[in-house]
UniProtKB/Swiss-Prot annotation:
Transmembrane segments: none annotated. InterPro entries: BUG, Bug_dom1. CDD domains: PBP2_Bug_TTT. One of its GO terms (cellular component) is periplasmic space. Its main location: periplasm. Belongs to the UPF0065 (bug) family. This is UPF0065 protein BB4329.
Length: 335
């Protein structure tokens, strides 16, 4: 009998065991390699940017400016897809349920990402778990405005008058950040502002200009053209300091100390999108918004360019959810 046969058997047995281990690990190794492979080949086709606002709105215009530059940076078309309605939840749901492959993104503001989910019953998605931040794009302050013929001349007069009498304020929706700004003023200043929720911004603007409602709280981007044309007068912006585009307009904190609510447009993606894809998008979008040519176009439209990491953006959204949830409880606002 050949003395080398046992050694040969041992070698064969070792090879068989090694092959078996490789076969068992193959699915795991393949699964781990898929995200990396996707990131290396992404994007290989056009990307859809779902916008939580109507075509022609200031949110839509901001999204198109960024998408145009992002297309050039990525070498693929970024197609803007406006999906207005339901305070942004229609657009958010479309993206939350999309395949997390980097080819479907959401462009939305705080109302759609924070306020509407807190104030809407039975949403078919979880805004915190089903969506994740890609990058901030632009700070868009909310503004408090009156019609040009209003007797209210400044924010101090509004606050003083609303402490003794009910004053109605128009917003573009009951589940909007605009409404919570009004409720915040009530809580901090002891005013009696009463919300009139419109289905969208345009009819609210029409009634403010016509004098049917005395006060408007809405995004500065939509109000800015009316303010510049003289049809509305700005009383305050919702930020902690004055806005560069309207330096003569006071911040709300000048009349109500401690009150400031940052409002931001953010690009989001379905949860589970490869981190490499999200990081690449974050880098490109930060570069785009830091470009003075883009930043200078934001300001006349009521926006100030923003940059930040995915982690910092996620933290900001979490903080706002906590803040607004407490405000809703204090003001007895229920979904």
């Amino acid at each position: 009998m050949n003395k080398n046969i046992p050694a040969f058997h041992r070698r064969c047995h070792g090879l068989v065991q090694g092959l078996a281990r490789t076969l068992l690990l193959a699915p795991v190794l393949l699964a781990l390699s898929v995200p990396a492979a996707q990131a290396q080949t992404w994007p290989s086709r056009p990307i859809r940017m779902v916008v939580a606002a109507g075509a022609g709105s200031s949110v839509d215009v901001f999204a198109r400016l960024v998408s145009e530059r992002l297309s050039k940076a990525l070498g693929q078309a970024v197609i803007v897809d406006p999906r207005p309605g339901a305070n942004g939840t229609i657009a958010a749901q479309a993206v939350a349920s999309a395949k997390p492959d980097g080819y479907t993104l959401l462009y939305a503001g705080n109302s759609a990402l924070v306020v509407a989910p807190l104030m809407t019953k039975d949403l078919p998605y979880d805004a915190e778990k089903d969506l994740e931040p890609v990058a901030p794009v632009v700070y868009v302050p909310l503004a408090i405005a009156v019609g040009a013929k209003s007797a209210i001349q400044n924010i101090q007069e509004l606050v003083a008058g609303a402490k003794t009498d009910e004053v109605f304020f128009a917003t573009p929706g009951a589940a909007s950040l605009s409404r919570l700004i009004g409720e915040s003023i009530n809580q901090k200043a002891g005013t009696r502002l009463v919300n009139i929720a419109y289905p969208s911004s345009p009819p609210a603007h029409t009634d403010i200009i016509g004098g049917q409602v005395p006060i408007l709280i809405d995004g500065l981007g939509g109000i800015a053209p009316h303010a510049k044309s003289g049809r509305m007068r700005l009383l305050a912006v919702s930020t902690a300091s004055r806005f560069a585009g309207f330096p003569d307009v006071p911040s709300i904190s000048e009349a109500v100390p401690g009150l400031a609510t940052p409002s931001m447009n953010i690009v989001m993606a379905p949860a589970g999108t490869p981190a490499e894809v999200l990081d690449l998008l974050n880098r490109h979008i930060n570069e785009i918004t830091a470009d003075p040519a883009i930043a200078s176009r934001f300001i006349p439209m009521g926006g100030e360019s923003a940059q930040g990491s995915r982690q910092d953006t996620a933290a900001m959204l979490r903080e706002q959810r906590v803040e607004f949830r407490k405000l809703m409880q204090t003001a007895n606002i229920k979904p």
